[in-house]
Curated annotation (Swiss-Prot):
Biological process annotations from GO: cardiac muscle tissue development; heart contraction; membrane organization; muscle cell cellular homeostasis; muscle cell development
Name of one Pfam family that matches: Sarcoglycan_1
InterPro entries linked: Sarcoglycan, Sarcoglycan_gamma/delta/zeta
Residue ranges, Cytoplasmic side: 1-37
A GO CC annotation given for this chain: Golgi membrane
Protein's name in the database: Zeta-sarcoglycan
Extracellular side: 59-299
Protein family per UniProt: Belongs to the sarcoglycan beta/delta/gamma/zeta family.
Glycan attachment positions: 62, 110
Keywords, in A-Z order: Cell membrane, Cytoplasm, Cytoskeleton, Disulfide bond, Glycoprotein, Membrane, Signal-anchor, Transmembrane, Transmembrane helix
């Protein structure tokens, strides 16, 4: 024991002691103590609930090291499994589906795919709606999956169909508002080919000729008014075993022989008026064609 400690101990023992000394308690007592315990208990309960909610959210959302739920973060990008809903616009560079499943895009109203340039301007748009599918771009192309050749292309100047055959199955056929250029028009086997213009003219032109062929059927040309066959530099050639001209008018012929009018006429002579009109005249010993016939005079 040191000297200082000894002096302090002897001094404390020599101090007079009072019998009625008052003691003051040190600490938190009463309602303050109860409030402190209540807040500590409330904080503990909050921590437990918070921890339980965190564990429940991690369990429900399926948080892992690779991602969250159906969302997986890989080196190549983000991978989604199952059905995913996007409430806001989605900006991506490429969208791929799995090798064993298709890619399905679904919306309650429509599906719109936009393409923009580096300045943010809209360069192409594809909209799939409930009533129509609209494509807005400079050029629209449909290519074959095998060799990549263009099956259909459309732009402001022309529409090109690259398929081997264009088949129209509608009952009204194909309606063209303007001219059509094609090297070959044919119908399906055992079907009729019909070219019709209900309110205007139908014109077929070709610099090296127009050929109409019906190998196993008839060829009919019907019109309401006049049918013109015109050759400016050549000739009109009719070649068939039998050539029939029906509904030709019959001209009158005055004969001095009374027997010709009484007998039934079965043979007629084909006559031509100066204006080119054909008519029939009763055949006789000589020619019965007359330029003064009523057919030529009234034509």
């Amino acid at each position: 024991m040191t000297r200082e400690q000894y002096i302090l101990a002897t001094q404390q023992n020599n101090l007079p002691r009072t019998e009625n000394a008052q003691l003051y308690p040190v600490g938190i007592y009463g309602w303050r103590k109860r409030c402190l315990y209540f807040f500590v208990l409330l904080l503990l309960v909050t921590m437990i609930v918070n921890l339980a909610m965190t564990i429940w959210i991690l369990k429900v959302m399926n948080f892992t090291v690779d991602g969250m739920g159906n969302l997986r973060v890989t080196k190549k990008g983000i991978r989604l499994e199952g059905i995913s809903e996007f409430l806001l616009p989605l900006y991506v560079k490429e969208i791929h589906s799995r090798k064993d499943s298709p890619l399905v895009l679904q919306s309650d109203r429509n599906v719109t795919v936009n393409a923009r340039n580096h300045m943010g301007q809209l360069t192409g748009q594809l909209t799939i709606g409930a009533d129509a599918v609209e494509a807005q771009c400079k050029r629209f192309e449909v290519r074959a999956s095998e060799d990549g050749r263009v099956l259909f292309s459309a732009d402001e100047d022309e529409i090109t169909i690259g398929a081997e055959k264009l088949k129209v199955t509608g009952t009204e056929g194909a309606v063209f508002g303007h001219s059509v250029e094609t090297p070959h028009i044919r119908a399906e086997p055992s079907q009729d080919l019909r070219l019709e213009s209900p309110t205007r003219s139908l014109i077929m032109e070709a610099p090296r000729g127009v050929q109409v062929s019906a190998a196993a059927g008839d060829f009919k040309a019907t019109c309401r008014k006049e049918l013109h066959l015109q050759s400016t530099e050549g000739e009109i050639f009719l070649n068939a075993e039998t050539i029939k001209l029906g509904n030709l008018p019959t001209g009158s012929f005055s004969s001095s022989s009374p027997s010709s009018s009484s007998s039934r006429q079965t043979v007629y002579e084909l006559c031509v008026c100066p204006n080119g009109k054909l008519y029939l005249s009763p055949a006789g010993v000589g020619s019965t064609c007359q330029s003064s016939s009523n057919i030529c005079l009234w034509s």
